[in-house]
């Protein structure tokens, strides 16, 4: 007998189905067939280099297989375990995990960070590695508070093996007081973003030659945090910002606005309802602690939450709303 595997491809705005004839696997092969990689955040703080990180994650080389016999111009990508991952154009340049993150070791020496966490997302189609820098951002204290916020600085690199994400290196910060995590709200703070083209290696090398500019990125980020912490905010100004970020009158939107307003003066988590920095923290606290993330057929709640915190779209939206209302 011959089994048929249906592969759906989008080409010229039309979905086409192709049938691959293959010999059916044995019972043993079916039993031993591997499931997609599940989301997990691995502690890699004892890793000296990228090879150590990838060894801890048990990552090998990915491979490709031509599909010209059924669809000219496409190929199949398999992960390091031989499992089918996705179908891409035959011109897609597959970057091996060791290639995709090799630059991080040089960046580690330049910036002085230590590898911290790493893991797979999107069922093994994307991989990230994050490092923690020694330097921190301290927000100026206010009033009788002896100490301001402490923000840890992270350097995070992400790539995909199916073209769904360019290789991206960006600055992220973690608020120590309450574990609010957020991507940088200024997309100009990306260290590099390189698409999966045939010249991606040369482009990445050029981007890393400018790595000394990362310290300027951190300086600009620190200066913006200081500006936010020095600008006092009235309750009515906060309400305007809240309405810009969460537009509409639905029950879901009202719930989000109410939760964020409660976070604006949540002293337990270090927000005091006084400054533009408190405003910003109200939204990141909502995103970190209050926003409901749901499980889907392919992703867990934990992965969806992790992915939302790594997305710069929400903090960028908040920062733009603050600028619109407060002109800072």
Annotate each PLM feature.
Residues 2-59, 119, 134-328:
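Intrinsically disordered, low-complexity regions enriched in serine/threonine
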Residues 90-114:
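Amphipathic alpha-helical segments
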Residues 72, 110-116, 152-154:
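Short small/polar-residue motifs
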Residues 109-135:
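A short acidic/basic microdomain associated with nuclease active sites
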Residues 66-91:
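A short, surface-exposed helix-loop junction/capping segment
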Residues 4, 74, 126-128:
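A generic structural signal for beta-strand entry/edge sites
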Residues 55-70:
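An N-terminal amphipathic alpha-helical segment
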């Amino acid at each position: 007998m011959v089994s048929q595997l249906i592969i759906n491809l989008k080409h010229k705005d039309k979905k086409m189905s192709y049938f691959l004839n293959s010999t059916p696997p044995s019972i043993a092969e079916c039993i031993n067939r591997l499931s997609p990689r599940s989301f997990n955040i691995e502690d890699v703080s004892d890793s000296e280099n990228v090879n150590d990180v990838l060894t801890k994650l048990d990552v090998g080389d990915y491979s490709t297989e031509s599909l010209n016999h059924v669809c000219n111009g496409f190929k199949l990508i398999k992960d390091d375990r031989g499992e089918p991952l996705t179908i891409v154009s035959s011109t897609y340049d597959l970057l091996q995990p060791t290639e995709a993150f090799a630059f991080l070791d040089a960046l580690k020496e330049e910036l002085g960070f230590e590898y911290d966490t790493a893991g797979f997302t999107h069922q093994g189609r994307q991989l990230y590695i994050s490092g923690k820098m020694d330097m921190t951002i301290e927000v100026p204290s206010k009033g009788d508070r002896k100490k301001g916020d402490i923000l840890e600085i992270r350097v995070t690199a992400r790539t995909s093996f199916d073209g769904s994400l360019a290789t991206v290196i960006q600055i992220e910060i973690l608020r120590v007081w309450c574990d609010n995590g957020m991507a940088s709200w200024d997309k100009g703070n990306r260290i590099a973003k390189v698409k999966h083209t045939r010249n991606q290696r040369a482009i990445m090398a050029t981007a890393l030659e400018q790595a000394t500019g990362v310290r300027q990125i951190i300086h600009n980020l620190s200066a913006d945090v200081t500006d936010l912490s020095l600008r006092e905010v009235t309750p009515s100004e906060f309400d305007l910002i809240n309405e810009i970020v969460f537009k509409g009158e639905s029950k879901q939107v009202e719930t989000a606005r109410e939760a964020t307003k409660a976070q604006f003066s949540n002293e337990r988590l270090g927000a005091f309802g006084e400054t533009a920095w408190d405003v910003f923290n109200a939204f990141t606290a909502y995103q970190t602690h209050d926003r409901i993330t749901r499980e889907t057929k392919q992703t867990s709640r934990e992965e969806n939450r992790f992915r939302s915190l790594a997305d710069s779209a929400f903090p960028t939206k908040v920062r733009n709303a603050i600028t619109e209302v407060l002109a800072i």
